[in-house]
Swiss-Prot record:
Entry protein name: GTP diphosphokinase CRSH3, chloroplastic
Pfam families, alphabetized: EF-hand_7, HD_4, RelA_SpoT
EC assignment: 2.7.6.5
Cited InterPro entries: EF-hand-dom_pair, EF_Hand_1_Ca_BS, EF_hand_dom, HD_domain, NT_sf, RelA_SpoT
Family statement: Belongs to the RelA/SpoT family.
This protein's record includes keyword Secreted: no
CDD domains registered for this protein in UniProt: EFh (cd00051), NT_Rel-Spo_like (cd05399)
Organism: Oryza sativa subsp. japonica (Rice)
Keyword match Lipid biosynthesis: no
Binding site for Ca(2+) 2: 515, 517, 519, 521, 526
Length: 578
């Protein structure tokens, strides 16, 4: 009946000697990283077939019986046959093997989000299209017009942030609304999975592009993930962006959470086993469910920073460092599925078992099952005190336990859009309209937490401020354009660099970086873009310094109870991440 596990995304990987899916099981609370096992060499026919079948089996198992129909299986198989050779032969960053591995990670993420075969197939070939290894005509011919249309729409979502200044909140808000209202939601979710993979491979990009991409993710894509209800995907996108944009602040948060990690892991591991035994031994619960999963939860660095810096909490008031999740499988015909009375009763009974085991904190109990959130989220959140008894006992943060059914969890993890797709929805225009309205509202609520992030014009939105900025850029350009022909030539740039103590090689490298149209000179528009990058870099560094000082003051106060322990190490060699 019981099955204790960890609720983390596992990358699809293929062993050389045997097909299958690589499951990277780690300690509770750790983020699962994709397996890096080498794929079969192109010349080995038997191994290639093993690779194809292994990936196919792994993906269809993730999709579940209700999604992996015979027609969807055929589509997925065609996508694999199309994508794997193209990616391996086409190469890309890190070679063909890495391109294949990344495509499989994207496909696995989409399968975990309960996307249908069209979306997963589109995700499989997106990487090959991005690298030019496949043409859109190939995709349409092999996978059909619908899958090709999803790929095209996902590319539009990808390009959308480049059309606006995402650092400007009004522009970012309008862009989020456009993505949610104008594009197929499945294409948005496809781009979110691709973006998550891209954020894990940012080191191949120039530093300025790393910052630009991270800001786009923080201001647009993480909020889109929240809007469609993919909360865990949103948290991971936020954390990856946070690490790149504010490396010093991230280091302080990571250091503090890591200092408590060993004790937290021990507590979570012991508590998981204890709770699992209690739930599987409970006769009343056994009558209503067929299975129970208990798992540890990952603690977001970005959400911790928001609580400490933006909400003004003290470190000892951040109570959800410890976390578990209980997922229940209600018995068929026991009053309904995850939304039925049987599932609801099982969740409430689990709450009773938890209260009998540990000291709960009623004021922090949140019943989103009886009273769901506006976006449809349903779960029971319970807080319990895990401190050791007695005056000499070790004090610990509260443990938050989330209790939900399998169907509730799928809706929470995959989002309302994927849940509706899974249930056969989004075919009714009114239902699709209602879901989009919910998503638009959710995106705006989430955006409230980011109001003080760097703005494109320093927070000013007036025409005068924009004109002043443009004037400064124009004056600087005129000073560098010594012959006044409206362009900065290679000779002029070299002279400037030599005046600054650099050489001709540095001038050539800078020209390659800034010369967007590769005509050998810099136009005023290209120079303005460079100025914009410099301005954004300065603002991010200033904000990082501000966050760092706030966190330094809060987190370097050692609590007498032993709750807060901060290692006073020199982190200067670890902070240059952007």
């Amino acid at each position: 009946m019981a099955n204790a596990g960890v609720n983390e995304t596992v990358a699809v990987a293929v062993a050389i000697d045997a097909p299958g899916v690589g499951h990277d099981h780690g300690a509770a609370g750790e983020v699962r990283r994709p397996s890096t096992r080498r794929l079969a060499p192109a010349g080995s026919g038997g191994r290639l077939m093993a690779e194809l079948l292994g990936v196919f089996n792994g993906l269809t198992e993730r999709m579940g019986e209700d999604v992996a129909t015979s027609s969807s299986s055929r589509l997925l198989f065609r996508a694999l046959k199309l994508a794997l050779p193209a990616l391996r032969d086409g190469g890309g960053d890190g070679g063909g093997g890495q391109s294949v591995s990344r495509a499989l990670v994207v496909a696995a993420s989409l399968a975990d989000l309960q996307m249908d075969a069209e979306v997963i197939s589109a995700g499989m070939v997106r990487g090959a299209l991005d690298t030019g290894a496949l043409a859109m005509a190939d995709v349409e011919a092999q996978l059909g017009a619908s899958a090709a249309g999803l790929v095209e729409e996902s590319l539009k979502v990808k390009r959308a942030p480049s059309e606006v200044d995402v650092a400007d909140e009004e522009a970012a808000s309008a862009l989020r609304k456009r993505c949610l209202s104008s594009y197929d939601i499945r294409a948005v979710i496809l781009e979110l999975a691709v973006k998550l993979d891209a954020m894990k491979h940012l080191d191949v990009l120039p530093k300025h592009q790393q910052r630009t991409t991270s800001l786009e993710v923080l201001k647009v894509f993480a909020l889109l993930a929240h809007a469609v209800g993919a909360g865990e995907l949103s948290l991971e996108l936020e954390d990856l962006s946070f690490q790149r944009l504010y490396p010093q602040a991230y280091a302080h948060i990571d250091q503090w959470l890591s200092s408590q990690e060993d004790d937290c892991k021990r507590v979570i591991a012991a508590s998981k086993e204890e709770l699992l035994r209690a739930l599987t031994a409970d006769d009343e619960l056994r009558c209503t469910v067929t299975g129970v999963d208990v798992m540890g939860r990952y603690k977001s660095r970005f959400s911790t920073m928001k609580k400490l810096v933006k909400d003004g909490r003290r470190p000892e008031d951040v109570n959800d460092i410890l976390g578990m999740r209980v997922i229940l499988d209600p018995r068929p015909g026991g009053g309904g599925g995850g939304d039925g009375d049987g599932g609801d009763r099982a969740c409430l009974r689990t709450h009773e078992v938890i209260k009998a085991m540990w000291k709960d904190v009623p004021a922090r109990t949140k019943d989103y099952i009886t009273r769901p959130k506006g976006n449809g989220y349903r779960s029971l959140h319970v807080a319990v005190d895990m401190s050791e008894p007695g005056p000499e006992g070790k004090k610990r943060p509260l443990m938050e336990i989330q209790v939900r059914t399998r169907e509730m969890d799928m809706a929470a993890v995959g989002g309302q859009a994927s849940h509706a797709l899974y249930k056969g929805g989004l075919t009714d225009p009114e239902e699709a309209k209602r879901l989009k309205a919910i998503m638009l509202a959710a995106a705006e609520v989430a955006a409230q937490h980011l109001r003080d992030e760097p703005a494109g014009d320093g927070g000013q939105t007036t025409a005068a401020a924009s004109a002043a900025t443009a004037g400064n850029v124009e004056r600087a350009f005129q000073l560098l354009d010594k012959n006044g022909d409206g362009r900065i030539s290679m000779e002029e740039l070299t002279e400037i660099m030599e005046d600054l103590g650099a050489g001709g090689h540095d001038a050539e490298e800078l020209m390659r970086l800034l010369d967007a149209n590769s005509d050998g000179s810099l136009s005023s528009d290209e120079f303005a873009l460079f100025q914009k990058r410099v301005k954004l870099k300065t603002k991010l560094e200033n904000k990082d310094d501000e966050y760092k000082e706030i966190l330094k003051q809060k987190l370097q106060k050692v609590d007498d109870t032993g709750l807060i322990h901060v290692y006073r190490k020199n982190l200067s060699d670890k902070l240059v991440l952007v």
